């Protein structure tokens, strides 16, 4: 688990195209408890300077529910589910993280990149939509409901990705999650993101056969491309994506 401002040996710091683009450090953290990531991203944000590179942390969490700072605890429907609940300082309501889900934390200096919060959210959403499209899954935004939803078919309207950020001193932390191949039953114990009866789905249930690591690589490429306003080629060299801290 990284601690601010020291960098783990496994970090890959690369500058995406074009050459003038700002560098991004990608950290592959494997399976890490949620509390450890939460504490580390806040410490990183508090310690960063105007010269600190932006970072993306890619992680898989053991089962945990997280409740946003304005979230209503009543959206946890089963008090004795056996899954811990952590109250956090991001926006949004309650969600679930667990094995088989990609979680990507975006530690971004919005002022340096001249990004408004809404612009950053839109670019994150577009990166997720493009990632899912790479596996022949059509998805879309939904007005008034942050996240990404299945666009067509029998699971139309089901949520497949969640998003929630915190901005402190012009810098973001927290991020997004994409359901790849996971046990979806814990979502039945909550109103996902505060919406009663909202179906939650994963890529495997929609027929996608790609594994977690492959999808994570695709997602990171798209996120970095969109951080710099790109909409085309992958932004990270494959060798950098393949580094891990195993």
Swiss-Prot record:
EC number: 2.3.1.181
Biological pathway: Protein modification; protein lipoylation via endogenous pathway; protein N(6)-(lipoyl)lysine from octanoyl-[acyl-carrier-protein]: step 1/2
Any one of the GO BP annotations: protein modification process
Active site: 193
Chief place where the protein resides: cytoplasm
Domain of life: Bacteria
Ranges of residues in domain BPL/LPL catalytic: 50-231
List of residues binding substrate: 90-97, 162-164, 175-177
Miscellaneous information on this protein: In the reaction, the free carboxyl group of octanoic acid is attached via an amide linkage to the epsilon-amino group of a specific lysine residue of lipoyl domains of lipoate-dependent enzymes.
Function text: Catalyzes the transfer of endogenously produced octanoic acid from octanoyl-acyl-carrier-protein onto the lipoyl domains of lipoate-dependent enzymes. Lipoyl-ACP can also act as a substrate although octanoyl-ACP is likely to be the physiological substrate.
Protein name per its UniProtKB record: Octanoyltransferase
Origin species: Burkholderia pseudomallei (strain 1106a)
